[in-house]
Amino acid sequence: MSKPAAPRRVGEKEALAVATTVRGSPYKLNLVAGLIRGKKAGDALNILTFSKKAMAVDVRKVLASAIANAENNHNLDVDALVVKEASVGKSIVMKRFATRGRGKSTRIIKPFARLRVVVREQQEEAE
């Protein structure tokens, strides 16, 4: 007797990719994620490739992973994919210290963020 399959976390014509620890603040990551929301997958990859933001590299990797998941795991058409969701949240916070003058120290906070990208297959509109 085998265990039943886990229910899908996204819809039938959708694929998902998640990065749990992206180094950088969620605010900065959300600025880049906002560039691709609602765009076609190919256009979104181009936007991220030529973006000057440092976080664009991490967002591009997650988007490429979501596209690969759609193609290989769910047999979706890559040319018809649209970025349905690009959500950002807080992850862990590393705490470090820096030495200061007169024997004192200061706390340094190094934030991490989570990124969840969902792509879906959009049907071509008949004209």
UniProtKB/Swiss-Prot annotation:
GO cellular component labels: cytosolic large ribosomal subunit
Keyword Oxidoreductase: no
GO molecular function: rRNA binding; structural constituent of ribosome
One Pfam family here: Ribosomal_L22
Keyword entries, A-Z: Ribonucleoprotein, Ribosomal protein, RNA-binding, rRNA-binding
Keyword DNA-binding: no
InterPro entries attached to this UniProt entry: Ribosomal_uL22, Ribosomal_uL22_bac/chlpt-type, Ribosomal_uL22_bac/org-type, Ribosomal_uL22_sf
SUPFAM superfamilies: Ribosomal protein L22
GO biological process: translation
Gene3D superfamilies reported in the protein's UniProt record: Ribosomal protein L22/L17 (3.90.470.10)
Role description: This protein binds specifically to 23S rRNA; its binding is stimulated by other ribosomal proteins, e.g. L4, L17, and L20. It is important during the early stages of 50S assembly. It makes multiple contacts with different domains of the 23S rRNA in the assembled 50S subunit and ribosome.
Subunit structure of this chain's protein: Part of the 50S ribosomal subunit.
HAMAP family for the chain: Ribosomal_uL22_B (MF_01331_B)
Protein family according to the UniProt entry: Belongs to the universal ribosomal protein uL22 family.
Protein's UniProt name: Large ribosomal subunit protein uL22
Record lineage: Bacteria, Pseudomonadati, Pseudomonadota, Alphaproteobacteria, Sphingomonadales
